[in-house]
């Protein structure tokens, strides 16, 4: 069981590296933003792969959806190119998903900074009253 997990993990890691290069070199759509692949999860049977991406500088939901549409439309082409570059019996179907973790991380960081600043103001006010 542990060996199966490590194999799918290795395949996912290699797919992440290969896809990053393929998207940069082979997808010529000018509407496509600066795509970063944050991770690839491969199913146990290696039939499907979830590809998690972010788009640099894009917070607009419409532009993100457009980038997702472009990548999902190119999934078959990218799968064919992966088949040529990777030595796998069968190449997984690619399913692109937008990775919200970076945006959520920035929101949490801002929330923590705000709480620390507010706490500092409160404690600063308490010290001046004494």
From Swiss-Prot:
GO MF annotations, alphabetized: ribosomal small subunit binding
GO cellular component: cytosol
Compartment(s): Cytoplasm
Family to which this protein belongs: Belongs to the RbfA family.
Keywords for the protein's UniProt record, in alphabetical order: Cytoplasm, Ribosome biogenesis
Entries under Pfam families matching the protein: RBFA (PF02033)
Protein's recorded name: Ribosome-binding factor A
HAMAP family: RbfA
GO biological process: maturation of SSU-rRNA
Sequence intervals crossing the membrane: none
Lineage per the UniProt record: Bacteria, Pseudomonadati, Pseudomonadota, Gammaproteobacteria, Pseudomonadales
PROSITE patterns per record: RBFA
InterPro entries per the UniProt record, alphabetical: KH_dom-like_a/b, RbfA, RbfA_dom_sf, Ribosome-bd_factorA_CS
Domain of life: Bacteria
Quaternary organization: Monomer. Binds 30S ribosomal subunits, but not 50S ribosomal subunits or 70S ribosomes.
Function: One of several proteins that assist in the late maturation steps of the functional core of the 30S ribosomal subunit. Associates with free 30S ribosomal subunits (but not with 30S subunits that are part of 70S ribosomes or polysomes). Required for efficient processing of 16S rRNA. May interact with the 5'-terminal helix region of 16S rRNA.
Residue ranges of coiled coil: none
């Amino acid at each position: 069981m542990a060996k199966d997990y490590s194999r799918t993990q290795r395949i996912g890691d290699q797919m992440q590296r290969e896809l990053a290069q393929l998207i940069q070199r082979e997808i010529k759509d000018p509407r496509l933003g600066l795509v970063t692949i944050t991770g690839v999860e491969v199913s146990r049977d290696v039939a499907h792969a979830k590809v998690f991406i972010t788009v640099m500088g894009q917070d607009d939901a419409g532009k993100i959806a457009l980038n997702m549409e472009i990548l999902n439309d190119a999934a078959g082409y990218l799968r064919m190119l992966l088949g040529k570059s990777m030595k796998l019996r069968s190449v997984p179907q690619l399913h692109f998903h937008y990775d919200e973790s970076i945006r959520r991380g920035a929101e949490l960081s801002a929330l923590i900074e705000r709480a620390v600043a507010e706490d500092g103001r409160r404690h600063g006010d308490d010290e001046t009253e004494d």
